[in-house]
Curated annotation (Swiss-Prot):
Function: Required for the chloroplast avoidance response under high intensity blue light. This avoidance response consists in the relocation of chloroplasts on the anticlinal side of exposed cells.
Coiled coil location: 90-161, 188-216, 383-419, 481-501
Keyword line: Coiled coil
Species annotation: Arabidopsis thaliana (Mouse-ear cress)
Protein name per UniProt: Protein PLASTID MOVEMENT IMPAIRED 15
Coiled coil as UniProt keyword: yes
Classification lineage: Eukaryota, Viridiplantae, Streptophyta, Embryophyta, Tracheophyta
Length: 579
């Protein structure tokens, strides 16, 4: 049985090492640790019970051994005794003792078989506890792998957060550079517009002066034309007046001289006006060239203002795009910061749970080491008990053989005694026919009186023992009922704790799924293109799940109720009392 149980445990351990267990949560690991601790307690209790049963069996075997030795001594005494009636009584006692010894041997065999069953059940429980320890080890490794994956996800989220912050800084730098360029271009455009306005004002002033000059030129030209007409009229009059007299000639000469002088003055004035007109024409030509240049400058300024307007509009579009990108990055940054805070809180929780798992792992290692030591000790003890049981069985078999031989001899002696008793009975019947009294020996009289008193005492003692046994049975039933009630309460409490642990595990799984979903959304939003209007990020609501059904847990303890057996009677005292 023990070898098979050990082989099964080795096979299960090898199969468990070959399996790849999935990643589990810390709450499952803690629950498994609690269950393993409970099973360790149950194993220790069952081991203590098996040790007590073993001690009882050893005590019973020692008592049986003593009783067998006493029987052997009594057999020797019976063989050595010389009295025939004493041999008869001792033979009867030996038969009773033999029957009692056989009953005791049957009880001892039952106890030994029960001890073997208890040892096999304890070994099976120990194998199950070792399997639980292996499962705990794999679960702790899975928790460590989960923590490493969470750390990697946190590092990736931190890198994304840094990338978003760097993109925000670069966008702000570009925005500032564009604003600076825009301000510089606006200042240049304003300077150009001021210069052009000044030029336009100067050109308008020159145009007004040219208009004044044109007006003066027109007036001078009208004066010149009038003088020319007057000169023509004067020449006509001079031709008419040539045929008149000398008196009139002198007057005309004088008037002619005056007209000539005025004509010369007019000529000089006209020449000056002509020069002024030429200079005015030159000035007008220069003004026209300047006006053409101003027109060209105005056209070029209009083109430049249109280009600057386009550039400003493009800059406005770029600034709007940058503002939208900044808003998007801000929203992403807020989402990433919220996710990072949640991941950091989860990481702290997982770090705490990992520390608990490490502590429980160390405790499990210590318990495993203690299990191994206890395993070796129990192996040695079981081997010793097996050897002792085999030795005691061989001794019992030898004693039984001796008892069979003694029984055979006693049967022969009984036959002889029966023949003698029949002879005595016949002789006494023959004597009783002649007289009303029967003569018996003093030994027979004393034996019968003692036997009657001892029978009364034994009957009274048996009645008292039966009453005490009934009381003890009632007390044991009460204690058993109390134990069953406490065990039922403990089982209900353990079921409630298991349900709470399952609920916590599902809640932690839902939060982890939500966090993973948010991280995936952030990744998809960062990869997606186009403008996304920033919206306030709401709180994450945990997913409500249905309450788990109450199933009977696989790890419910199996309680071994060891009934109180009747104590092996001390045969030496019984025989001494009977004798």
């Amino acid at each position: 049985m023990l070898n098979r149980a050990m082989e099964n445990s080795d096979m299960k351990r090898n199969s468990s090492t070959l399996l790849d267990l999935p990643v589990v949560k810390s709450s499952l690991v803690v629950e498994a640790i609690h269950m393993s601790r409970k099973k360790l307690g149950w194993y220790n209790e069952s081991r203590r019970d098996s040790e007590t049963v073993k001690a009882r069996v050893e005590a019973g075997l020692s008592e049986v051994k003593k009783s067998v030795e006493e029987l052997a001594l009594l057999i020797k005494r019976s063989n050595r005794s010389a009295g025939f009636q004493e041999k008869d009584m001792e033979v009867l006692k030996m038969e009773e003792k033999y029957a009692e010894v056989m009953r005791v041997l049957e009880v001892v065999k039952e106890e030994v078989s029960r001890v073997k069953l208890d040892v096999s059940s304890v070994l099976i429980e120990r194998v199950a506890a070792e399997e639980k320890v292996e499962e705990l080890r794999f679960k702790t490794e899975g928790g460590l792998r989960l923590l490493e994956s969470l750390k990697k996800e946190i590092e990736v989220a931190n890198e994304e957060h840094l990338m978003v912050a760097l993109g925000k800084i670069e966008a702000l730098k570009g925005y500032k550079e564009i604003e600076r360029q825009r301000e510089g271009k606006a200042i240049k455009v304003l300077d150009l517009l001021v210069e052009r306005n000044k030029r336009i004002k100067n050109m308008l002033e020159e145009a007004e002066r040219s208009k004044d000059i044109e007006i003066e030129l027109f007036e001078t030209s009208t004066d010149v034309e009038m003088l020319e007409t007057q000169l023509k009229l004067f020449k006509k009059m001079e031709r008419r007046v040539q045929g008149r007299d000398s008196s009139s000639m002198s007057r005309s000469n004088r008037s002619f001289g005056r007209g000539k002088y005025s004509l010369s003055v007019l000529k000089e004035v006209t020449e000056g006006k002509k020069e002024e007109l030429a200079s005015v024409k030159v000035e007008i030509f220069r003004v026209m060239t300047v006006m053409d240049a101003l027109r060209n400058e105005i056209i070029r300024a209009r083109d430049e203002t249109a280009c600057l307007g386009k550039i400003l509009r493009e800059d406005d579009v770029k600034i709007e795009k940058l503002n939208s990108k900044i808003l998007i990055e801000k929203s992403k940054l807020e989402v990433v910061s919220i996710a990072e805070e949640r991941i950091s809180s989860l990481a702290e929780n997982f770090v705490g749970s990992l520390e608990k798992i490490k502590k429980s792992r160390n405790a499990a290692k210590k318990e495993e080491f203690l299990f191994k030591e206890e395993k070796t000790v129990t192996k040695a003890e079981t081997q010793k008990t097996k050897l002792d049981i085999d030795k005691k069985e061989s001794e019992l078999n030898s004693k039984l053989d001796e008892l069979e031989k003694v029984k055979h001899t006693e049967a022969l002696v009984l036959e002889k005694l029966e023949s003698l008793v029949e002879d005595m009975m016949e002789s006494r019947e023959m004597e009783s026919e002649h007289c009303s009294t029967i003569t018996i020996s003093r030994f027979e009289y004393e034996y019968l009186s003692k036997h009657a008193s001892q029978a009364e005492e034994t009957a009274e003692k048996k009645v008292a023992a039966a009453a005490a046994w009934v009381e003890a049975l009632k007390a044991s039933t009460k204690s058993f009922l109390m134990k069953t009630e406490t065990l039922m309460r403990e089982s209900e409490m353990t079921k409630a704790e298991e349900e709470r642990e399952v609920f916590r595990m599902e809640r932690s799984l839902s939060t982890k799924r939500l966090v993973e979903g948010e991280i995936q959304k952030i990744k998809r939003n960062s990869e997606a293109e186009g403008y996304i209007s920033p919206k306030p990020v709401g709180k994450f609501t945990p997913v409500q799940r249905g309450k788990p059904r109450r199933y009977s847990s696989v790890g419910t303890p199996t309680f071994f109720v060891i009934k109180k057996k009747k104590k092996v009677p001390r045969l030496a005292k019984f025989f001494s009392r009977r004798s």
